[in-house]
């Protein structure tokens, strides 16, 4: 699957965005049918969020990190972090880490994450990858984590000892992106996170 182009706005890139959005919508529709017919476990899907997530994907660069929620499948498809095949492997709880790299079938569907370690236990070069912190189920809980991720970038800019840690940060220039739903934006965690990011200047 091709990924969404970051800065190119030609006919082909717009059509590619449309294709990704269309595939994501139909993955949601098919996934819901599979759940309602009893062929797959509990399902949560991202239909209706496609356009906003395609826009976010165009702004997202290597080294950036996502702290999101369970409706972000279009974004994950657009950045090549997930695919329709991996999405359905997760829906069916496939225990194969190659088929379902987010959690090897241990999480509910729509719970995405990228691996920060190689198979041998060494760190992956996060500055060269599109990163996603692992999603958790309590809605709104991605926001306090977003505070930590954004504050870490500030520390990488300002603390000399951290500048020597290669591979984790591009001198604090990465951006932490957060996504949240309407209901969760009314929770205390959301407002406390907004306040904390302001106080910490993160």
Map each language-model feature to its residues.
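Cofactor-/ligand-binding subdomain signature composed of acidic, glycine-rich
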Residues: 1-41, 62, 70-72
């Amino acid at each position: 699957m091709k990924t969404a182009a970051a800065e190119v706005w030609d006919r082909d890139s717009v059509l590619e965005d449309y294709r990704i959005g269309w595939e994501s919508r139909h993955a949601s529709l098919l996934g819901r049918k599979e759940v309602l017919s009893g062929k797959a476990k509990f399902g949560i899907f991202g239909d209706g969020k496609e356009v906003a997530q395609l826009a976010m994907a165009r702004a997202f660069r290597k080294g950036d990190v996502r702290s999101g929620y369970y409706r972000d499948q279009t974004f994950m498809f657009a950045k090549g972090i997930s695919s329709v095949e991996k999405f359905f492997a997760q829906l069916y709880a496939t225990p194969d880490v190659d088929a379902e790299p987010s959690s090897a079938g241990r999480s509910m569907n729509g719970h995405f994450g990228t691996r920060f370690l190689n198979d041998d236990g060494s760190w992956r070069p996060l500055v060269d990858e599109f990163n996603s912190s692992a999603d958790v189920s309590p809605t709104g809980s991605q926001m306090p984590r977003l505070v930590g991720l954004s504050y870490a970038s500030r520390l990488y800019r300002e603390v000399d000892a951290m500048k020597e840690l290669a591979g984790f940060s591009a001198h604090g220039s990465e951006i932490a992106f957060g996504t949240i739903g309407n209901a969760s934006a009314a929770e205390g965690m959301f407002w406390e996170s907004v306040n904390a990011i302001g106080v910490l200047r993160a």
